[in-house]
A protein has these predicted regions:
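The conserved beta1-alpha1 loop
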Residues: 136-137, 299
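Active-site-proximal cap/loop segments of hydrolase catalytic domains
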Residues: 149-380
Length: 380
């Protein structure tokens, strides 16, 4: 027999099943509205360990056995769920905090059904409108049951942190048309947001912001060249010029970046010589004059995935055009922040940035005055 993990792509329920290879018979080990992972089987017994989690329940360890488990039932501290015994019950302290609830948002773009995840505070004051941050990369909805551990950010918003501080967070799925990656993101994200506003009346459509990192950072930069719908945006490690990015390398490996545009994620589908206009229209830097949305960029000078100069090109272009833009550079850091102190610093600055534009908070000094390289503290 073998053990397989089952997953429902519509409801996002999951579980483990034991299948007899001779008869085809299937036996349920565990299945339900939660995320099942970290599976282990006993070496000499038909007994299994695994974890289950939901947005409101931290990953806990469970035990299931096809053998006699009456000995486990004698332990009062063990809770039984669907014939599996819960061995741990961790993170009870979260009951003291405002925690997210998650809702599936169904919408359509390019004639296809898409899904997105909307996180909101479990309870909020009646009549109080919520600001919303839209985070995106490509597809995310399969993570419906993922527990969101609060932690300093390496590059993206922490859902639990922002929801506990009075925000809604929406994460839409995106599909792409080759040659039109930026336009595809724009359409899918806007369609998802339209549906959110129809369903969740607490969202303030005048206080919505964007956030993305890497490929998500590129899409963020593209969106603000095409729409003024969003009050502010934060782009991490964004490609801004597909021509110069195509001709660059991944500094961490020395790998050419050309394949990415011709064949994979960047989805242009041609070389610049055969698809000049596609490269131009999908490059945010050439439309920087259209930007009215305040933008925060993070791009680190030791980024081995997206050339640091991509963030610099976008920042310098927007500065020259006197647009509202800020750039964070963590010297020596990579594509995503590694040092905890830097992660904490970024988390604070992202919160202050979004609070200023979406919650009418005071403008922090670093946004009001800036800081030159010479003024940055030197590590000892």
């Amino acid at each position: 027999s073998i053990t397989v993990r089952a997953f429902n792509t519509q409801t996002k329920s999951s579980g483990f099943h034991k299948i007899d290879l001779l008869t085809g018979d299937s036996k349920v080990i565990s299945q339900g509205e939660s995320k099942h992972s970290r599976y282990l089987r006993a070496k000499d017994a038909d007994t299994y360990l695994f974890t289950k989690e939901t947005i409101r329940s931290s990953p806990n360890l469970f035990c299931f056995s096809f053998l006699d488990s009456s000995n486990l039932e004698t332990h009062d501290f063990l809770k039984k769920q669907n014939n599996a015994f819960e061995l741990t019950d961790i993170n009870l302290q979260q009951d003291s905090f405002v925690w997210p609830k998650v809702q599936m948002i169904n919408y359509r773009a390019f004639g296809q059904k898409l899904q997105g995840l909307l996180y909101t505070p479990l309870a909020s004051s009646i009549g109080v409108k919520l600001p919303m941050i839209i985070y995106f990369y490509e597809r995310y909805s399969d993570r419906f049951h993922d527990y969101k551990t609060p932690a300093p950010s390496a590059s993206t918003i922490n859902v639990s942190w922002f929801v506990s501080n009075g925000y809604a967070v929406f994460i839409p799925d995106i599909i792409y048309k080759v040659g039109r990656p930026g336009e595809s993101a724009l359409k899918c994200i806007n369609k998802g947001v339209d549906q959110v506003l129809k369903i969740e009346k607490r969202i303030d459509q005048k206080r919505m912001g964007l956030q993305g990192q890497s490929w998500g950072g590129y899409q963020t930069a593209f969106l603000i060249t095409r729409t003024n719908r969003y009050a502010c945006a934060m782009a991490g490690a964004p490609v801004s010029n597909m021509f110069s990015a195509y001709g660059g390398i991944r500094y961490s490996s020395g790998m050419s970046r050309q394949f990415q545009y011709e064949k994979t994620q960047s989805r242009i589908g041609k070389t610049p010589w055969k698809g000049f206009y596609s490269y131009k229209k999908n490059s945010p830097v050439f439309y920087a004059n259209k930007v009215n949305t305040p933008l925060l960029i993070m791009h680190n000078d030791n980024d081995g995935a997206v050339p640091f100069t991509q963030g610099v090109e976008l920042f310098m272009g927007l500065r020259r055009l006197e647009k509202p833009v800020w750039m964070l550079v963590y010297n020596g850091e990579q594509h995503n922040l590694r040092k905890r102190a830097n992660r904490l610093d970024l988390s604070i600055r992202m919160s202050e940035f979004f609070d200023y534009y979406l919650k009418n908070s005071l403008k922090p000094d670093w946004m009001a005055k800036g800081r030159s390289l010479k003024e940055k503290p030197t590590e000892k």
